[in-house]
């Protein structure tokens, strides 16, 4: 469920932002600036919370928050660059694809760890991956791609989005865009730092107790391999695979094709990821190991240093949800009371009770008309109709009927989208 939420459902909001950018507010400067600011704040805040956290699943969740910020920054560049948005368009589409595949891999891996250890705290699951080379390799595929290491899809997508910010800064001459570019690199460094934290804890520290060699069923291993394998394949074939895949979505996002080939391994493109990785290693060795870890005995213990008063969940999300619940409760109660009052007024004025009249139900009338009034025939028709209606009611209440209706609805939505796009 977490893999689907992070990898698939979070893209629903991004699709909405892309539709607004491409179709509703194309070229709108204020909309692009709003996305740029929101994306910058989101990518830094999510990555910072992930650095402080010790819970594997919470780190990955905050990482998703940060990665959505990266995608929003790419969407903002796509909007602000107008006709010159080829880098931003390709980068945003590939970033979405990379994030979905990476989080599918890492959340499935977190599920494997939890199912075998029944814990998610790094202090309790440390060393679980030691002696498991396939699990080690699958984690590295996801982590390296998310950190933007060359040879993986994440490097291609992150490079394109970063270079679109460089192009936007040069075109606009805005110090604000330059600041966002450096926040982009800094957030990339934080991404590398918290991924290194997970990697060292899972695969290099000594385990609390022996974990064994077996860690998943053949189906689990197959799912992880299928999720992780496209990351290096697309990363090693950017011109042959990654760019053509991104080009399929260009009409949807309002993007333009490349005017020239992109040299991904040129120093100008490698410089961005080199800066991010340098920042990441500095944060890991100078902050995480010195401030967020404490040596107790032979092994280091991860500490919770994030202030409780800065908890987004406790300070923002829960109060907002409680406030919305109370406001909507008052509104709905007022609407309900108003309807009751209107019904009462109507029954005492122009909708007073009339004298009872003999009334034949639609079902009885239909049976009477079908049988021309014959008593015995009416009884047989009533029994037959009752059987049909009972069968229909049982069908409507079954799970298969609900799934059939859901599939029919999805097909209708898909046809409408295809007709709209093509």
Predicted regions and their residues:
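Hydrophobic cores of alpha-helical transmembrane segments in multi-pass integral membrane proteins
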Residues: 188-190, 231, 276-282, 411-418
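Transmembrane alpha-helical segments in integral membrane proteins
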Residues: 188-204, 277-297
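Loop-to-transmembrane helix boundary motifs in multi-pass membrane proteins
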Residues: 130-134, 212-229, 399-409
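Hydrophobic alpha-helical transmembrane segments
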Residues: 176-188, 261-283
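Alpha-helical transmembrane segments and their membrane-interface junctions
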Residues: 145-161, 228-249, 334, 412-420
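Aromatic-capped, Gly/Pro-kinked transmembrane alpha-helices
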Residues: 5, 241-273, 291-422
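Hydrophobic membrane-spanning alpha-helices of multi-pass integral membrane proteins
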Residues: 12, 39, 142, 220-235, ...
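Hydrophobic transmembrane alpha-helices and their helix-loop junctions in integral membrane proteins
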Residues: 1-216, 230, 236
């Amino acid at each position: 469920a977490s893999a689907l939420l992070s990898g698939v459902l979070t893209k629903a909001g991004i699709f909405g932002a892309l539709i607004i950018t491409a179709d509703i507010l194309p070229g709108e400067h204020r909309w692009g600036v709003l996305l740029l600011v929101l994306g910058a704040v989101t990518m830094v805040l999510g990555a910072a919370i992930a650095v402080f956290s010790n819970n594997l699943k919470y780190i990955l969740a905050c990482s998703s928050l940060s990665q959505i910020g990266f995608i929003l920054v790419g969407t903002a560049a796509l909007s602000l660059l107008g006709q010159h948005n080829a880098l931003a368009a390709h980068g945003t589409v590939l970033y979405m694809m990379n994030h979905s595949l990476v989080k599918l891999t890492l959340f499935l891996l977190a599920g494997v760890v939890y199912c075998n250890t029944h814990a998610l705290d790094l202090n309790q699951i440390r060393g679980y991956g030691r002696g498991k080379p396939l699990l080690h390799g699958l984690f590295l595929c996801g982590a390296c791609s998310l950190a933007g290491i060359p040879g993986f899809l994440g490097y291609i997508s992150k490079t394109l989005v970063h270079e679109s910010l460089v192009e936007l800064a040069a075109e606009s001459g805005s110090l604000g865009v330059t600041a966002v570019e450096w926040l982009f690199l800094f957030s990339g460094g934080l991404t590398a730092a918290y991924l290194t934290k997970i990697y060292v804890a899972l695969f290099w520290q000594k385990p609390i107790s022996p974990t064994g060699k077996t860690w998943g069923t053949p189906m689990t291993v197959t799912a992880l391999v299928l999720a992780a394998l496209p990351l290096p394949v697309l990363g090693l074939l950017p011109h042959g695979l990654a760019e053509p895949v991104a080009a399929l979505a260009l009409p949807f996002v309002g993007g333009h094709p490349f005017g020239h080939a992109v040299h991904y391994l040129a120093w100008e493109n490698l410089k961005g990821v080199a800066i991010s990785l340098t920042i990441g290693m500095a944060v890991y060795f100078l902050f995480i190991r010195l401030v967020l870890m404490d040596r107790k005995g032979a092994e280091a213990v991860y500490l919770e240093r994030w202030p409780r008063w800065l908890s987004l969940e406790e300070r923002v999300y829960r109060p907002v949800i409680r406030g919305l619940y109370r406001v909507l409760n008052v509104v709905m109660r007022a609407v309900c009371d108003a309807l009751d009052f209107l019904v009462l007024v109507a029954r005492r004025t122009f909708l007073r009770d009339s004298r009872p009249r003999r009334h034949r139900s639609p079902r009885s009338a239909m049976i009477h008309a079908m049988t021309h009034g014959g008593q015995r025939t009416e009884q047989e028709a009533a029994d037959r109709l009752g059987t049909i209606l009972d069968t229909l009611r049982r069908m409507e209440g079954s799970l298969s009927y609900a799934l059939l209706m859901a599939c029919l609805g999805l097909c209708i939505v898909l046809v409408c989208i295809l007709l709209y796009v093509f």
